[in-house]
Amino acid sequence: MAHLMTVQLLLLVMWMAECAQSRATRARTELLNVCMDAKHHKEKPGPEDNLHDQCSPWKTNSCCSTNTSQEAHKDISYLYRFNWNHCGTMTSECKRHFIQDTCLYECSPNLGPWIQQVDQSWRKERILDVPLCKEDCQQWWEDCQSSFTCKSNWHKGWNWSSGHNECPVGASCHPFTFYFPTSAALCEEIWSHSYKLSNYSRGSGRCIQMWFDPAQGNPNEEVARFYAEAMSGAGFHGTWPLLCSLSLVLLWVIS
């Protein structure tokens, strides 16, 4: 009887170890080189030789089509009917950051570690707490200080009766710094925490760069690998306490 229990426990430990390793391997694969299940994303990333202007850094491997990249540069485009000029004309210095933000969101295949499922009519997945390099966030905030807005969360709460977003009743237009007093407030609050201000700098391999030189390769590939491996490893190592407990029971039975 003791021998049978020993064999059963041994098989259980081996099975749990195999399952943990399998989950880690599967998770690592699904977190890398993937596209979100969202409104305009391709099903799988691939080359797009004619990506437009600010979206062109992703042309060798992209989740967006050429048409999507062109629309990302337009005011009130068909993508989301979003009006950047809802409180007067947004400065070109500020708008380029929102265009780049749109290109990153639509085109990047390196956001897998931060993709979350959502129950929304226009998308099934979103990104959450993507660690944005501190310089990119700071520059975005600095370049938008002379532009105006009427809300701190641009994901919801707009008046869409005209077919595009307008300020809701009672919302007043103020400089960006009124609604976003810090760079962290801008990057983290504007899209419902899609981004999180990172303490890491560009080139560290630990934060996502909104801007990069494609001639030097895409630095976000390394960043995605780092976080995917960290997440997968956490899942695997999380099973060790239970495995150790079972092993102790096994040793007790054998003795």
UniProtKB/Swiss-Prot annotation:
Glycosylation sites recorded in the entry for this protein: N67, N159, N199
Q: Which cysteines are joined by disulfide bonds?
A: C35-C63, C55-C103, C64-C107, C87-C173, C94-C144, C133-C207, C137-C187, C150-C167
Residues bound to folate are: D101, Y105, W122, R123, K124, E125, R126, H155, K156, G157, W158, N159, W160, S194
One cellular component (GO) term of this entry? external side of plasma membrane
A Pfam family annotated for this chain is: Folate_rec
Which residues form the lipid moiety-binding region (GPI-anchor amidated serine)?
A: S232
Q: Which keywords describe this protein according to UniProt?
A: Cell membrane, Cytoplasmic vesicle, Disulfide bond, Endosome, Folate-binding, Glycoprotein, GPI-anchor, Lipoprotein, Membrane, Receptor, Secreted, Signal, Transport
Look up and give the membrane topology term: Lipid-anchor; GPI-anchor; GPI-like-anchor
Gene inactivation effect: Embryonic lethality at about 10.5 dpc, due to gross developmental defects, including defects of neural tube closure, craniofacial defects and defects in heart development. Embryos can be rescued by maternal folate supplementation.
Q: Where, by tissue, is this protein expressed? A: Detected in kidney proximal tubules (at protein level).
Does the record bear Transport in its keywords? yes
| Signal peptide (UniProt feature, chain positions) | 1-24
Q: How is it modified after translation?
A: The secreted form is derived from the membrane-bound form either by cleavage of the GPI anchor, or/and by proteolysis catalyzed by a metalloprotease.
Q: Which residues form the propeptide?
A: 233-255
What is a biological process (GO) this protein takes part in? regulation of transforming growth factor beta receptor signaling pathway
Q: Does the keyword Lyase apply?
A: no
- Report the GO molecular function annotations: folic acid binding; folic acid receptor activity; signaling receptor activity
Subcellular location field: Cell membrane; Apical cell membrane; Basolateral cell membrane; Secreted
Question: What is the protein's major site of localization?
Answer: membrane
Q: Could you tell me what this protein does?
A: Binds to folate and reduced folic acid derivatives and mediates delivery of 5-methyltetrahydrofolate and folate analogs into the interior of cells. Has high affinity for folate and folic acid analogs at neutral pH. Exposure to slightly acidic pH after receptor endocytosis triggers a conformation change that strongly reduces its affinity for folates and mediates their release. Required for normal embryonic development and normal cell proliferation. Required for renal folate reabsorption.
Q: Which family does it belong to?
A: Belongs to the folate receptor family.
According to UniProt, the name of this protein is Folate receptor alpha
Organism field: Mus musculus (Mouse)
